[in-house]
Every structure is written in structure tokens, then in C-alpha cells.
């Protein structure tokens, strides 16, 4: 049984991800981190899901039972956990969140002592420990060595200072009217605070979490309401976060929702113009072909990697780069953060608007993207794609029609993601029907 997916362990709370799994997983991770322990402290944060209370208590039980002390900081963005784990010199950090998923899902993400997401090799080692009954039992400590847990409510200030330090000192947000959709999620306090302290006129949406409304018709996955408000209020720009605030969607002053690849392109160019861009930009294999053309036109190289912001960061480390991201809105400025941080991206885009004295639409309009169609097809089984009869011929036929293809399985669900890209949208729509029918027969019997 495999526990870890594309981004930590994730599943339906109370079913797959129940208190038993959370406690045992915390013990397994704690056993792994014990070998390199310095402070014997592990940081635990969460988003605003009601199930977070159950999972948090289970994690605390697991860690303290093997002798770890736990620092609980309550609802905070995922990037805040990455930052604070290193800043507070903890052995590791744990974030309880299912990111953009509905409230009934939850997840557990781990960070090492430097605030980095774990490699697949480390995740595999933790899985091996999880299934080793003897090792789990042997790790329990005597009564006098049981760890302690304490809750700290004032660490938000440290994170706010770090975020504000990413914004240019010679700029102010005083001339900007900004609408923030915080998705009833982890950024509901910190995002408005940061923008207000930097001088912006701030209108906040979806900032009343009740444990069940996170991401519900709001936030980065549902920016249509934000777009309506931006137009109605004649705001300069709108920013939509997801439940744990590690991704960002931008809405321009016309109410148009920006594609993440457009955002990547203009921010990369902004960094280059400032002399701050190191090496090549990193994007994922699903990035739009027009992004590469835009970057190359401006003398910027593009490297690609698998989907997942931890793979973006790994590629950045390998090529000596400091900027990259995903079409979905996970964007990494590694000079400022170890993971995607929606707040940092929002501030950098605001700085770009202010420094250029241009509207959001005129800036984002520089990148002319090609049409893409994505279908998430539910499937009965995940067969080896290389062994599916007729697939090679299908891809060759599409290639001959100047259609780029990417077919890949979801890391967490029984889905295959079918991506087609071409200059002709009508051709795409026609061919997508054929592709869907092909995979329905191949993977659903």
C-alpha cells in the first residue's frame, strides 16, 4: 500500500485519513527525523478544515508518544509552515491540509528542518517505517520521556515580516485597490494584514471559515465570483488563494482570470529586467507551449519537470535557478521561500504593476497562449501507458495534426489527465472526443 501521493498523504478525512493513520504516520515520520534530531521539536500547523482538529490531535499523540515535543500554531498557510520550521529551528514541520480539495478531504505534508518538502526517497523510508510493526512498537518511550505539546498563537508576526521583506522597499501599495479571495482558508487573517500594512485599499472575500466552507465556490479554483467583484468595485487587481494559500490566481481589472503560465512568463521577465533571474526558469510538463516561446524571445531558457511544486524546486536546485512554477498557480521565488507562496507571488505581481505603471491586463496580455483542453477521465485501473495497444499510433496521428499531447495518471485519484494543445480550438475539441473514447475503452474495459 502506498501512502504518499504527489503532495504528501491525502484522502477523505475519517475514512482513508483517519486518526489511526495520522497517529501512526506521525510516529513513523518522528522515528525517521529522530536520527537527525537537534532540538527535539516538531512544528504542526493546519488549514481551517474541521477534520484538522481530529488529525492534529492524532499527530500530537503519535509524536509525543515517541518522545517528541510538539509546537502547535493553528491555522497558517503551508508556506508559513515551511518558513517557520526553519526559523524556529525545529527538526521538522507538518502541515495538515488538502490544499484546494473540498472540506471532507484532508492531508498531511512534511517539511525537513530547512523547510524543504521531502524527497520521494525519504517518503519511501517513512512508509517502510509505517508498516514495520516492531519498529513502531519499539519507538514508544517510557512515561518520563513522553513529549510535551504547547500551542503558540503569536508566530504569525514572524511570517508576516518575512512576506513583507519580499516586497521592494522603495514601493508602496497605497495606489492599489485590491480584492482578496482567501477561500475561507489558511490565509484568512494573514493575507489582508499584509496588504493593509503595505498600504493597499483591501476588500476581502470568503474570510469567514466555519470548518466546512473551505474552497466552496471560492478561492483559486472558483475565481468567477472574484472576477465579478473586481469589475463591480473597479479594483486594480484581484488575488484568489486556495485553502492553504500556496497557490495564486490573478484576476485583472477587466475581470479576466489569468492563466498561470501568463503569470509565470511576465514575472520571469520582470526578474530578468531587474537582474535577479538566475539560470533558466522551471515549469512543468503541462505548461503551455507559448510560454517557452515568450521566454525564449526574451533570452530566457525554460526547463520542465513533473507536476508538483516540490519537483519544480528540485529542478531549480539542480540548475541553479531561483524562479519557476506551475500553470495551476504554484509559483516559487526561491530567493524568498522554499515552496510556492501565494502571498509572495501576489506582492511580486503588485510590484510589477507599480514599477511599470501598467494595468494588470496589459501586463498579462504580453503572453499569447495557445488553446489547451484538459479532460480528467475517471478510470477503473491504471495500466502501463506504454503497453496500451494503439496509443502510440494515436499520439503519432495527433502529432501529425500539430497537436501536442500529454497523458498522465493522477497521483492521488483514479483519474487519467488528458491534455491537448494546438492553435486551432475546433480541431482540439474534435480530437479530444476521440481521445476520451479511446481511453474509456482502454482503461474501463
UniProtKB/Swiss-Prot annotation:
A single Gene Ontology CC term: cytosol
EC numbers on record: 5.4.2.10
GO MF assignments: magnesium ion binding; phosphoglucosamine mutase activity; phosphomannomutase activity
One Pfam short name: PGM_PMM_III
UniProt cofactor(s): Mg(2+)
List of residues binding Mg(2+): 99, 242, 244, 246
Active site feature: 99
Entry comment on modification after translation: Activated by phosphorylation.
UniProt superkingdom: Bacteria
Any single biological process term in GO: peptidoglycan biosynthetic process
EC main group: isomerase
Key word Magnesium present: yes
Keyword line: Isomerase, Magnesium, Metal-binding, Phosphoprotein
PROSITE patterns reported in the protein's UniProt record: PGM_PMM (PS00710)
Catalysed transformations (reactions): alpha-D-glucosamine 1-phosphate = D-glucosamine 6-phosphate
InterPro entries for this protein: A-D-PHexomutase_a/b/a-I (IPR005844), A-D-PHexomutase_a/b/a-I/II/III (IPR016055), A-D-PHexomutase_a/b/a-II (IPR005845), A-D-PHexomutase_a/b/a-III (IPR005846), A-D-PHexomutase_C (IPR005843), A-D-PHexomutase_C_sf (IPR036900), A-D-PHexomutase_CS (IPR016066), Alpha-D-phosphohexomutase_SF (IPR005841)
Bound cofactor: record note: Binds 1 Mg(2+) ion per subunit.
Residues the record lists as Phosphoserine modifications: 99
Coiled-coil annotated residue ranges, if any: none
Entry function: Catalyzes the conversion of glucosamine-6-phosphate to glucosamine-1-phosphate.
Family membership: Belongs to the phosphohexose mutase family.
Protein name: Phosphoglucosamine mutase
Origin species: Campylobacter jejuni subsp. doylei (strain ATCC BAA-1458 / RM4099 / 269.97)
The organism's taxonomic lineage, starting at the top: Bacteria, Pseudomonadati, Campylobacterota, Epsilonproteobacteria, Campylobacterales
Amino acid at each position: 500500500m502506498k501512502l504518499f501521493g504527489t503532495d504528501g498523504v491525502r484522502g477523505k478525512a475519517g475514512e482513508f485519513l483517519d486518526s489511526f493513520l495520522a497517529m501512526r504516520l506521525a510516529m513513523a515520520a518522528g522515528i525517521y527525523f529522530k536520527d537527525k534530531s537537534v532540538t527535539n521539536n516538531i512544528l504542526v500547523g493546519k488549514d481551517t478544515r474541521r477534520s484538522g482538529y481530529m488529525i492534529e490531535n492524532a499527530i500530537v499523540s503519535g509524536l509525543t508518544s515517541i518522545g517528541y515535543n510538539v509546537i502547535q500554531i493553528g491555522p497558517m498557510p503551508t508556506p508559513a509552515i515551511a518558513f517557520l520550521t526553519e526559523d524556529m529551528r525545529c527538526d521538522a514541520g507538518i502541515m495538515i491540509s488538502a490544499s484546494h480539495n473540498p472540506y471532507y478531504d484532508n492531508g498531511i505534508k512534511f517539511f525537513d528542518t530547512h523547510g524543504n518538502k521531502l524527497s520521494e526517497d525519504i517518503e519511501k523510508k517513512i512508509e517502510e517505517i509505517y508498516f514495520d510493526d516492531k519498529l513502531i512498537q519499539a519507538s514508544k518511550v517510557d512515561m518520563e520521556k513522553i513529549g510535551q505539546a504547547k500551542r503558540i498563537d503569536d508566530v504569525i508576526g514572524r511570517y508576516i515580516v518575512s512576506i513583507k521583506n519580499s516586497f521592494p522597499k522603495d514601493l508602496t501599495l497605497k495606489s492599489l485597490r485590491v480584492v482578496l479571495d482567501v477561500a475561507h482558508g489558511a490565509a484568512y487573517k494573514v493575507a489582508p494584514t499584509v496588504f493593509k500594512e503595505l498600504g493597499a485599499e483591501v476588500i476581502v472575500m470568503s474570510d469567514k471559515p466555519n470548518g466546512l466552507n473551505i474552497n466552496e465556490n471560492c478561492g483559486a479554483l472558483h475565481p468567477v465570483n472574484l472576477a465579478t467583484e473586481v469589475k463591480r468595485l473597479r479594483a486594480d487587481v484581484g488575488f484568489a488563494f486556495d485553502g492553504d494559500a500556496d497557490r495564486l490566481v490573478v484576476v485583472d481589472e477587466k475581470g479576466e482570470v489569468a492563466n498561470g503560465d501568463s503569470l509565470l512568463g511576465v514575472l520571469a521577465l520582470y526578474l530578468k529586467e531587474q537582474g535577479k533571474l538566475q539560470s533558466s526558469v522551471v515549469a512543468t510538463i503541462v505548461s503551455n507551449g507559448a510560454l517557452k516561446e515568450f521566454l525564449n524571445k526574451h533570452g530566457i531558457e525554460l526547463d520542465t519537470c513533473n507536476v508538483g511544486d516540490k519537483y519544480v524546486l528540485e529542478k531549480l536546485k539542480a540548475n541553479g535557478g531561483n524562479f519557476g512554477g506551475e500553470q495551476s498557480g504554484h509559483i516559487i521565488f526561491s530567493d524568498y521561500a522554499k515552496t510556492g507562496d501565494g502571498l509572495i507571488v501576489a506582492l511580486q505581481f503588485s510590484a510589477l504593476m507599480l514599477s511599470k505603471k501598467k494595468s494588470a491586463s496589459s501586463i498579462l496580455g504580453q503572453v499569447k497562449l495557445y488553446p489547451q483542453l484538459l479532460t480528467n477521465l475517471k478510470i477503473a485501473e491504471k495500466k502501463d501507458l506504454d503497453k496500451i495497444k494503439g496509443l502510440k499510433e494515436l499520439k503519432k496521428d495527433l502529432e501529425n495534426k500539430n497537436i501536442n499531447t500529454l497523458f498522465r495518471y493522477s497521483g492521488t485519484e483514479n483519474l487519467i489527465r488528458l491534455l491537448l494543445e494546438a492553435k486551432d480550438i475546433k480541431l482540439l475539441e474534435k480530437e479530444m472526443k476521440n481521445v476520451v473514447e479511446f481511453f474509456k475503452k482502454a482503461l474501463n474495459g
